[in-house]
Amino acid sequence: MTGEVRRKKILQMLQSQPEPMSGTALAKEFHVSRQVIVQDIALMRAENHGILSTNKGYIYRSDAVRDERPKRVFYVRHNTEQVLEEFLTITELGGTVLDVAVEHELYGQIRVDMLIESVQDARDFSEKLSACKDNPLKVLTDDCHYHTVSAPSEKLLDLIEAELRDKGLLL
């Protein structure tokens, strides 16, 4: 199978899957290494296919490039134990955590898609973080980081901002 054919099949699989698919699962499906899948995804994203890479795997979002919901970037600082509190604050008010970013002195901005859309997503991420040996990106910048958050309205973004501020999470 050529790379082009494989990429078309990967895209079809992701478009038909409502849940994220891991790079490992895709690699097994197509009998290639995970690195080949990572390269295929990078090529498809360069062609503006709406593929997001989240902590749960790859997901196709037809609205990923054209998400028209209001967005706001929040600059926050908290310890690892407060990650769940932060995400619950956002999701319980109807927000979605689209990504996390840090400003690294050497590498510049490092940004990772998250797509935390619900209370359950927040809890799942928190459990995964607790079980994981790796540290979150925020440890690179003394716990300071950015989240792009979308919500159905500017009013909800205002409420999210106020709640994050009241909880001492917003810088």
Residues of each region from the PLM?
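Residue-level marker of alpha-helix boundaries and capping positions
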Residues: M1, L14, H31, R77-H78, ...
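Extreme N-terminal segment that seeds HTH/winged-HTH DNA-binding domains in transcriptional regulators
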Residues: M1-K28
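Conserved active-site and cofactor/substrate-binding residues in soluble primary-metabolism enzymes
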Residues: V5, M21, V32, S53, ...
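Solvent-exposed alpha-helical segments within well-ordered globular domains of core cellular machineries
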Residues: K8, Q12, K28, Q39-A42, ...
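N-terminal helix-turn-helix
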Residues: P20-S53
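Conserved beta-strand edge residues that scaffold enzyme active sites
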Residues: K28, Y58, H104-E105
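Minor-groove-contacting beta-hairpin "wing" of winged helix-turn-helix DNA-binding domains
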Residues: I51-S62
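Mid-protein regulatory/catalytic core that forms ligand/cofactor-binding pockets
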Residues: E68-L171
